[in-house]
UniProtKB/Swiss-Prot annotation:
Pfam families: ABC_tran (PF00005). It comes from the Bacteria. Gene3D superfamilies: P-loop containing nucleotide triphosphate hydrolases (3.40.50.300). Transmembrane segments: none annotated. This is Cytochrome c biogenesis ATP-binding export protein CcmA. The gene is ccmA. ATP binds at G35, P36, N37, G38, A39, G40, K41, S42. Belongs to the ABC transporter superfamily. CcmA exporter (TC 3.A.1.107) family.
Length: 207
């Protein structure tokens, strides 16, 4: 399977944010997207996730599972917000996402306790999400990536609020996903430690 971006452009209001962005990622490959604030990193991820229509160009899958035409159907999107209900427990939040997303063809997610263990927080899944620190909340949002299988991970500043040990833990999750043949696109201001990752620097436009 290959994730293809072909001549993508996008606008914010009347302003063109980026133009003619193209890349191809095969199974087991990662792309790290860098650039200053306002360069369009988050917008690019939203276009890839199918949350925003591009001004031009297209996103497509090549040699993907039968019946799946757009990457959004096979993607996890982790944005700046963690997409968890503060009043629900961690376990309830992860259960919702596991059931809502289900598994894509070619793999299966792991159990809730196992996922919480993978992010180092198995002993607090009974707590309301809102009780957790910012770093713990981000770790639990990462657990959402592994309770339901999606071959494509689209990650916006994934290590925000994480300490050094959690950074390493996250890098391990990504490495395991790539080893399974997954694809990762991550926008960041910080080094992510993805061995062998491709890179895309976005500069934006001066208006």
């Amino acid at each position: 399977m290959r994730l293809m971006a072909e001549g993508l452009s996008a606008r914010r209001g009347e302003d063109l944010i980026f133009n003619d962005i193209s890349f191809a990622l095969a199974a087991g490959e990662a792309l790290v997207v860098t650039g200053p604030n306002g360069a369009g990193k988050s917008t690019l991820l939203r276009v890839l996730a199918g949350l925003l229509e591009p001004e031009g160009g297209r996103v497509r899958l090549e040699d993907g599972p039968s019946g799946f035409e757009h990457p959004r159907e096979l993607s996890h999107y982790l944005g700046h917000r963690n997409a968890m209900k503060r009043e629900l427990t961690v376990e309830e939040n992860l259960t919702f996402w596991q059931r809502f997303l289900g598994d894509s063809p070619g793999g299966s997610g792991i159990g809730l306790v196992e996922a919480a263990e993978a992010v180092g927080l198995a002993d607090i899944i009974h707590l309301p999400f809102g009780y957790l620190s910012a770093g713990q909340q981000r770790r639990m949002a990462m657990a959402k990536l592994i309770v339901a299988f999606r071959p494509i991970w689209l990650l916006d500043e994934p290590t925000a609020a994480l300490d050094l040990s959690a950074d390493r833990l996250f890098a391990g999750l990504v490495a395991a996903h790539l080893d399974r043949g997954g694809i990762v696109v991550a926008a960041t201001h910080q080094p992510l430690g993805f061995a062998g990752a491709k890179s895309l620097e976005m500069t934006g436009f001066v208006h």
